[in-house]
Amino acid sequence: MSKKQKTNLIRIIVSAVLVIGVWVSPLTGWLEGVLYLIPYFIVGYDILLKAVKGIFRGQMFDENFLMAVATVGAMALGDWREGCAVMVFYQIGELFQSYAVGKSRRSISDLMDIRPDYANIESGGALEKVDPEDVAVGTVIVVQPGERIPIDGVVTEGEAAVNTSALTGESLPRQVKAGDEVLSGCVNLSGLLHIRTTKEFGDSTVAKILDLVENSSMKKAKAENFITKFARIYTPAVCYSAVALAVLPPVVRLIMGNAPMWGDWITRALTFLVISCPCALVISIPLSFFGGIGGASAKGILVKGSNYLEALAKTGCVVFDKTGTLTKGVFQVLETAPEGMDAQTLLGWAAQAECYSKHPISQSLKSAWGGQVDTDRVTDVEELGGFGLTGRVDGHAVAVGNRRLMEKLGIQPIEPQRAGTVVYVAVDGVYAGWILLGDVVKEHAAQAIRGLKAEGVEKTVMLTGDANAAARQVASQLGVDDVHSQLLPADKVRQVERLLKERREGRLLAFVGDGINDAPVLARADIGIAMGALGSDAAIEAADVVLMDDDPAKIALAMRISRRTLRIVYENIVFALAVKAVCLVLGAIGIANMWLAIGADVGVMVLAVLNATRALSAGKE
């Protein structure tokens, strides 16, 4: 408990003891009333002050005003005990609500407790702790075992395992060594690391994430906006209704020649006010969304606002950019077909001829061969745009490229039966075979598609710039419903616009990309999801939902968290309104007394807040 919460608890206990003491005492009359005022002011002075300030500001219609009018009115009618009890129980509910909200905020703070307190800089042979915001780009910082990396950078010295769970939600440590990039917010588990910073603290990963989480409450869901507007209309409406309930029936009775019974009707009106307090809704709905966003962040899913969390539950179509989302974006040798030599020799000719090239295919060929390239053995290399390259390896003329290069050299290559990227090789003018490469499908990609179907997604679509055969093979392997290939970035935007027109009423479209090359499409979709955004400023800026690692299965998890959060929100709305409606009717016709009003108000608030805190664990299912 905070200091303020402890103070409020003491006030409640002291007031409750005094109320019971006066209740059981033999005192009656004005002396009893004066004694009841002592616990009343101890427990309720802050509510009365807020109500008075609200009146002077012209913002009188809130829960403080309702409680002040109800309790003062009850005591004015001689119901001293009831007036005190209403204030005590209301403050018990407020304390419980404050504790629940604080606990949820602390839970999220713990989950997102990634802001470093200091950075170590070597000075005069000793380590000096400085504020991370004072560290300039290019400074070498030292991170000891157990410390959090304060700023993004590159390891210059040392080797260690780092825990990235605060960013990605994954518990498996990552090994880093000299030359590797490291991100702020990760914890060094072993070994001393010297890191040269590549960004200022304000531009580092940890600062970007913290800013995103802190500002997520600014973008409200429709359910939250509904409650805000509802409370703005509802509170004045019940106040005017209470006035009407206190005045109209007695006036009607007077006109009809009966006793007006002012006391009875004013008591009913005051009971009506206590029951009508909208605290349960006003508090529990934002708390539910806050908890849902926190639960998602614990799993490495950053949602930029409760409006996007709500939208995820309504997603009917998910469109994927293939490379980097469903596939790793790394070429891998799938098959070889050598002619007159073994596969290793064929790979050797191709890899050595490609030794100077930085193209991803060249890197894949060198990796598949696994041998040590001696550049002194490679001469006369000439890259031919749109064809491939030629060169000499140990004096032998080697050509590596596509079918057009072979035909240009007068060689008729053999076509592979399998779809993929084909590299043909010729040595000394003789066809030597082909090497088939393909983008590697991510381990959990097929599971991710199945998970989306299980969450109610009606259609999955894959967009790619790859050739049609290769694209259809990947789509078939993963179970994607539709695929569009050989697309330029502008074509992808047009495809998404077409799909937006075709979607079913009330269903939304989500686009999943890497967040770097797909910014126009991410912006055009109803929900832009950037995947593998760890360390990518562009991804965090462009998307509505950011997945901090490369696991596509987390898209379905995000939808599951969204659905559970919304279920909790709707449970609270229906429960609170139903109980309030019944009790308001009972209060208006005189069946519900002040004690039932207290129970209805505090009980509904406590149960709604308890239910709302379940949203924090939504990602743990």
Describe the role of every protein-language-model region.
Residues 1-14, 234:
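N-terminal membrane topogenic signal
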Residues 110-111, 138, 306-517, 521-527, ...:
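Cytosolic catalytic headpiece
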Residues 52-61, 99-109, 287-306, 613-621:
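Juxtamembrane helix-loop transition segments at the membrane interface in multi-pass membrane proteins
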